[in-house]
Amino acid sequence: MAALAVNKPGAGVDSGRQGSRGTAVVKVLECGVCEDVFSLQGDKVPRLLLCGHTVCHDCLTRLPLHGRAIRCPFDRQVTDLGDSGVWGLKKNFALLELLERLQNGHIGQYGAAEEALGISGESIIRCDEDEAHVASVYCTVCATHLCSECSQVTHSTKTLAKHRRVPLADKPHEKTMCCQHQVHAIEFVCLEEACQTSPLMCCVCKEYGKHQGHKHSVLEPEANQIRASILDMAHCIRTFTEEISDYSRKLVGIVQHIEGGEQIVEDGIGMAHTEHVPGTAENARSCVRAYFSDLHETLCRQEEMALSVVDAHVREKLIWLRQQQEDMTILLSQVSTACLHCKTLQQDDCRVVLAKQEITRLLETLQKQQQQFTEVADHIQLDASIPVTFTKDNRVYHGPKMEIRVVTLGLDGAGKTTILFKLKQDEFMQPIPTIGFNVETVEYKNLKFTIWDVGGKHKLRPLWKHYYLNTQAVVFVVDSSHRDRISEAHSELAKLLTEKELRDALLLIFANKQDVAGALSVEEITELLSLHKLCCGRSWYIQGCDARSGMGLYEGLDWLSRQLVAAGVLDVA
């Protein structure tokens, strides 16, 4: 652009004045950071900062960010950026209007128009009559470039005035000559597939050459059609570029929100200072630390409670064992005294006869004490181990077996009693309607299930609620072979799940009689009972089974055990 401001030799005083004016215009239109000329669009669009200075878009994107703000490179004033970043800053429309007017040649006939052409990136064409002037028209007859003044002077006669003169933008393209027949211009395009590598042809090629008889079209319409498709493609590319740029800006904003950074803020007296703005990553880490800190505190409290339970159990056991020690010591002393007395009596026959009743009483006392010792010894397990089991909520249970209360419910004839006795005695029991309830204890691994089997007839169902108290798990049995009773089972299960006393109870559904031909599958029963909707927010599981063979029953107990007992302690004896 500086070259455009240099006065040409012979340009005169006016040319020098116009050149200096063009230089001043260019200086106004330059970015003060990169010294490149502003443009109407693209990376060199002028944008306004809060302080009033104008910087091109490209330089603004290169400025260091302070949180969500940038500093003016000239006066260091702060400008806050919104969610759109630099793209959200206002354009300098006064400069844009000036640029547009310069490119349209509205400012000055020579100097400013010349500068505008330079700004727009086009080559400057000099007037063929006077090189100090810039050409603005083209004479198609004379084939010369002329400025408006020289065009009037050279074509002032009647003959020359008839020459067609067009603006430079409408200047016809020079015809390309055929490489085979150099005296003929290319006028046609071959449309044959085999000729697409060399489709251009002149009239000789068309009539007599290698393109003879080929389908063809006229060069200019074909070029215009391709040119239109190129313009469409360029428009699509611009749209696509804008989409990519917008997406990139969003990515930059998201990265800034994730990483956080420094933000420039003003205090009460107007002094600017930086402060740290935490990103979403730091907030997430803080949430994790807070969660695990609370978890550690909760675990510490649960550990203290569990240790207090174990300590109390150990203390009670030691007190009882020491009491037994004292009792055994007293018993041993009494036995020793009786033996010594008997030994003393047997030394004299007369004394033995006289002490007969006393000896009889001693023997009876010893027999009673021996009987008591035998009974106590049978019930005492001399085992120093202290077995413990942990529940899912980190509570500790001491003892060889953890007791679980289970209620088995379902429609009549579903197989509840058959399942109970198969688990208890491992034998099949013929179906008999349950009048009232059955209760059995089933030991499985280190768990002891106390299972209450309640009758499922219509008149007994209102009594189910009396068995809900302290129930830890509900086993609901469904007859898979009776499709017509599924809706009735769904209704009873829905009522069951509304009970407050069963709010925290586990739900195990046995799809019984899977061995019967035509029985509903587990998936079909799940859908017909709407289990995903009905049991939302509750721990539940459905297990296909056959009460006759026992298939699937222990898989159900396994699921119950895993839900009730912490992982890794199921097999601890």
From Swiss-Prot:
EC top class, as a word:
transferase
Give the residues annotated as coiled coil.
351-378
This entry carries the following GO cellular component terms, namely: cytoplasm; Golgi membrane; lysosomal membrane; nucleus; plasma membrane
Instruction: Name the UniProt key words of this record, in alphabetical order.
Output: Coiled coil, Cytoplasm, Golgi apparatus, GTP-binding, Lysosome, Membrane, Metal-binding, Nucleotide-binding, Transferase, Ubl conjugation pathway, Zinc, Zinc-finger
B box-type zinc finger locations on the chain: 122-168
Write down what this protein is called: E3 ubiquitin-protein ligase TRIM23
* Region spans: ARF-like: 390-573
- The UniProt record lists the EC number as 2.3.2.27
What the record says about its domains?
The RING-type zinc finger domain is responsible for E3 ubiquitin ligase activity.
What does the UniProt entry say about where the protein is found? Cytoplasm; Endomembrane system; Golgi apparatus membrane; Lysosome membrane
Principal location class: cytoplasm
Per the UniProt record, the source organism is: Rattus norvegicus
User: Does the entry feature the keyword Cytoplasm, yes or no?
Assistant: yes
Q: What pathway, per the record?
A: Protein modification; protein ubiquitination
Q: Please give the biological process terms from Gene Ontology that the record holds.
A: intracellular protein transport; positive regulation of autophagy; protein ubiquitination; vesicle-mediated transport
